[in-house]
Structures are given as structure tokens and as C-alpha cells.
Amino acid sequence: MPDPASRRLLIQQGDADVARDLGADQIAALQGKPGVKVLSIPSAEQNYLAFNTGNDANPLLKNPALWEAARWLVDYDGITKDLLKGQYFVHQSFLPVGLPGALDNNPFKFDPAKAKAILAKAGIKDAHFTLDVENKPPFITIAQSMQASFAQGGVKIDLLPAAGSQVYARVRAKQHQAAIRLWIPDYFDAHSNASAFAYNDGKSSTVAGLNGWQIPELNKATLAAVAEPDAAKRLGLYKQMQEELQRSSPYVFVDQGKTQIVVRDNVKGYQQGLNADMVWYDRVSK
């Protein structure tokens, strides 16, 4: 059933046992209602801001001072708690919580004064960029919040909202200055994300490649980590890579999703992993 309002009605009336993909408003309306319970399960889905360092139309995009300032200009709590109503939580590294090796620290917070100081020290004035974004939640919601919060740090964002296919095409063609994007691992291993965000051999269309960012040391680190036979050492290498990208990279990792499922209170044994395909209905009973 495509309409989330209809799915909410079915689960509330007892005509369905499980309801998925409900909007934030539908979830909020069902919280605490008799006969149903809301499950919030971490998802591997992450939203991030990427600067296209290869776009020469705006030289500011390749300046690490802008990247650093941007990390302090996102209202992380306002986005996740107020605007997205708990359907996402703050997470600031490229491996999602739940994947082995993921950092769970969140070193950045909204601090426009700190961002202004970073920009001033770098001699950056009249900072501005265009931001490609899909014209639907949660992407446009995040982008509009950034437009307001970045302005408090003296950075002007011009939003370029469009259909998802158009944003995708512009990013693939490397025509964007910056973009709000979604990432989900292709498979359940740290290399899926590391090879996307840290690796750019100049040939493949990784996230790093699409944003013109190429660091030979990170290429070597990515290949070393995936080939490391010792599990503990391998996790340590991924933690080092995450710390390096937190320190300096053209990405601002904003949040991680929660898969919110509504089930009737007589449904037992529902389990779901990080990825959408990690659901085991054979364990469900009522």
C-alpha cells in the first residue's frame, strides 16, 4: 500500500500486523497508542554534505578551512531531534553505528562563533556555494536547516532543489558545487564505505572521485585495511581512517537513520539488521 496514512490506519485498526516506511508524523501519532508498539532500529543509511573540490567555478570548495568550518555550522541536534523527529540520530563518521569498526564519537556541534574564527584565520570572506538537494524529506529538510545555520556563520548557501534523478545526474557529471547525499553500504563490511569515501584511483566513480578528492595516502590505507588478515588490526585501521576524514575531508557526516517499524503488540520476534534486506520474518509469531 503506497500511502503511509493508509498504512497507519491499517496498523492502528488491527488490519495489519506490521507497518513499514511511515512518515515522522505517522510515527509520532502512533507513539503510546494502545495495541501497537514502535520499534526503532539503527539503519546503515547516512546523510552527508559533500563539497566538490573538482569544481573550479568556486575555488573555495577545495579549501580545507571551509570543510572544517562547515562541521561547526550544522545544527545536528536541531535536524535530528526537532526537524526529523527522532527518525535519525547524530553520527559523524563514515562507518555507521552497528558496523564493526565504526566510531561512535561525535566531536562536532553547532558553534557558529568557532566557524567564523576558522574562516577568519584562513582569510575567507563572503563564503558562498550552491547546494544541490533532492526536493523531498529528509534531504530538503536538512538543506533548509543548513541554509539557516550556515548563514549564522557568515556562509551563504543557495539551494538548488530538484528531483532525485536530476540531482543524481548532476553529481555523476560532477557539475555540483556541494550536495546533500544519502549513502547505504553495498555490503556488510567496512570496506564498502571506506572504498567509497576515502579511495579515488581516478578511474572509478567513488564518492571521493565524484567530488574530485584524491589523497594517495588514503588510497594506500584503504587497500591495506581490506587486505589486513588480523581482525583487530583491521578494525584499528578503519578507526584511523575515520579519524582522518573527521579531521580533514570534503564531507560533513550529519546523521544516521533509524528504521522505525510499527507492529501490533501481539507480534513477537521481529528482528532487523542494519540493511533493509536483513529482515528475518521466519522468526516472527503472534
Enumerate the language-model features and the residues they cover:
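Short beta-strand-to-loop elements that line the ligand-binding cleft
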Residues: 1-3, 20-21, 40, 131-133, ...
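Periplasmic binding protein-like
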Residues: 148-202, 237
